[in-house]
Amino acid sequence: MSTTKKDDYYHVGLTDDEVLQSREKNGINLLTPPKRPSLWKLYLEKFEDPVVRVLLVAAVFSLIISIIENEYAETIGIIAAILLATGIGFFFEYDASKKFDLLNAVNEETLVKVIRNGRVQEIPRKDIVVGDIVILETGEEIPADGELLEAISLQVNESNLTGEPVINKTTVEADFDEEATYASNLVMRGTTVVDGHGTMRVLHVGDATEIGKVARQSTEDNLEPTPLNIQLTKLANLIGKIGFTVAGLAFLIFFVKDVLLFFDFGSLNGWHEWLPVFERTLKYFMMAVTLIVVAVPEGLPMSVTLSLALNMRRMLSTNNLVRKMHACETMGAITVICTDKTGTLTQNLMQVHEPNFYGIKNGSVLSDDDISTLIAEGISANSTAFLEEAATGEKPKGVGNPTEVALLLWLNKQGKNYLELREKAQILDQLTFSTERKFMATLVDSPLIGKKILYIKGAPEIVLGKCKEVVLDGRRVDAVEYRSTVEAQLLGYQNMAMRTLGFAFKIVGENEPNDCTELVSANDLNFLGVVAISDPIRPDVPAAVAKCQSAGIGIKIVTGDTPGTATEIARQIGLWNPETDTERNRITGVAFAELSDEEALDRVMDLKIMSRARPTDKQRLVQLLQQKGAVVAVTGDGTNDAPALNHAQVGLSMGTGTSVAKEASDITLLDDSFNSIGTAVMWGRSLYKNIQRFIVFQLTINFVALLIVLLGSVIGTELPLTVTQMLWVNLIMDTFAALALASIPPSETVMLEKPRRSTDFIISKAMQSNILGVGSIFLIVLLGMIYYFDHSTEGMDIHNLTIFFTFFVMLQFWNLFNARVFGTTDSAFKGLSKSYGMELIVLAILAGQFLIVQFGGAVFRTEPLNWQTWLLIIGVSSTVLWVGELIRLVQRIIHKKNRNEK
């Protein structure tokens, strides 16, 4: 802490004792970080997956049988599946969390000037207490909530809290802005002083500040289930019902046939005569449990987790830092995006859109003529902003009022050195901008003409009203006569949501006073022209908005800006159509708050713009949209966005956003690009389709395996597939398949579809037909093999069982190629040469099956096959692929014919 000499401040500030008392009573100036779940709790959360829960039930039943039979391979396999699925999910979320913490690091040691014991001191921001007198200067972040004691031309950037980039602050009650979100004499932690200076008395610190309250709201638990979780719950329930129903029926049939009707219970005496009854009952009970275990797709939770994890990593390469794994897929289900304006749709960077100086030839390009030189000196001297020195190749940045920075940047592009012009022009008097005057004036001793010049800039209508003449190219006209022309220009700019400034000058005689106020009041200035300044939309936003709209996603702008500005931005990005949209499609935050829930529910889906919105308005909008069945994503970079970011199904923060916003989000857009949202939607939709493809592949296996075990037991043959063989098919091979299907790159075509409904079951009718159709064909072929082997000379010996097992695996192997293009008419070989992951996985499955057959022995109940048998199995089983190719070829021909007819 550093202390300066005693200054002539009339504020004494707190004493050391008062500081300690205030800190003890009101706490320190730190925001409580969101409570992080312990690693153990984070891991246990993975067990909330519905399919994992079904696996847990299966593991319990399997363990019972393992204890009875003293054979634990099945149980170990199921437990391994559970641990792998949960472990992978845990690792990737923990890894993302660590990356996020590094991204989101904040420094609470920033020094702040305060008055204590009558002296100006610099202390760390975290040491500020309620009652402290804080000195506010241009460019500084306000460290706590406070009440202004002094405000000299004070302007504050509240865009990260209210969405408003520049707010005028004052202690004069008559000048308060009644429409402002916060009173004009209050300043809030996290906002920035962009112009002027002042002092404030701290009212709230830490969590009691507005930003602290928003941070708390943003970390409240949001138990809204994800769309994928809802679908997997339905699937788990279906699988559980089918498994338990089939197992129950099988047990009942065998128990009645081979126990109730077989034994004469009246003649049984003693426990030794009842023993065969118990043994046979236990045998059929174990068969029932085996059916349940076979019905459960052990590879499904791992495949979903792998798909999410792979997409999590790959989305990072497209500037989407995914913090919560479920957000990868949920992005594909969103139906509404609620977006902030400032910094999300716009660049949050004021820039000169159109200079219109009437005295130079084309009005927008400065040259070396006298008027251009006057304009350059006026902009340079009549300003309090600065440009920071930029590194080679980088654009210069400014410090101070964003509007003045925009003017200096424009001057810089014109090849004028503002600093050199400012230093040469000796300032004699200056009136800083104020809301009362609505202009700024500076009197300089100009080296350009060796005379005094008064420069003025401000609200065009005010500046023009103080002018006698308007400077045109080569002539001057009466200001009153030219007013209508200027007003027409201003109206055009205002309709485009632009800020406008008027510029004027006056050459001051030697005998005239060096008093700006007196000189301006003479109303004999020369009007130079107007400049339109905009916060431009991001170049990629209109295309990104169109992309989302074509994908059936509704977009709603929620901003603290005025209705006019918000509407114009909406028009520029293609969201607002003046010919078709009405007042029903836009509303202010105040009007929205006055609506009852019933009235608001009636309007939320139609709304496109909410202006003058407060954090609570945005949060309520999200919750009402969810009540209407919408899947909502919220974008934002400010602290004001945090509650809505947290309560939405997917919160999307900007990489340059506030720490509170990023903490509340699920995905951080590292490049701050709205376009990345469209990319994330494409990834999410493609991921969902890849999961559906895996389900088609997986459930076909389970459907066939379930009926093979059931019918095999009915026929009375030896179990055609062993536990270890099913583990290879259901766990290891499925993991390879999951990797293959998850690595399919996203397709742009998914953005031409409408969002899926949250009520739609993950297994579509097309999937059902494929699973039942293909599965039935596989079943008939495999039952035919069982019948053939049963009636052959060798019977179902190890050799024939090995052939059966290998043929079963190869059927699934070739079906993997069909699953890869399920839902399309593409050939299974399309893009295969570029898909190195798929090629490696195909080789891994073939190599794994070869090693199991040739060297598995008693563990896998196999014996080596000769190369002729291998070729025969591969050739015959590949019919699955060729039939699929033929069907897709016919579909392509039909589609092409239909397109030509249209």
Kindly label every feature range from the protein language model.
Residues 797-801:
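Transmembrane alpha-helix entry/boundary detector in multi-pass membrane proteins
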Residues 770-785, 810-811:
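Alpha-helical transmembrane segments of multi-pass integral membrane proteins
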Residues 733, 737, 778-779, 802-817:
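Generic alpha-helical transmembrane segments
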Residues 765, 769:
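HAD-like small-molecule phosphatases
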Residues 787, 792-796:
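Long hydrophobic segments that form regular secondary structure
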Residues 1-755, 760-763, 776, 790-791, ...:
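Conserved cytosolic headpiece of P-type ATPases
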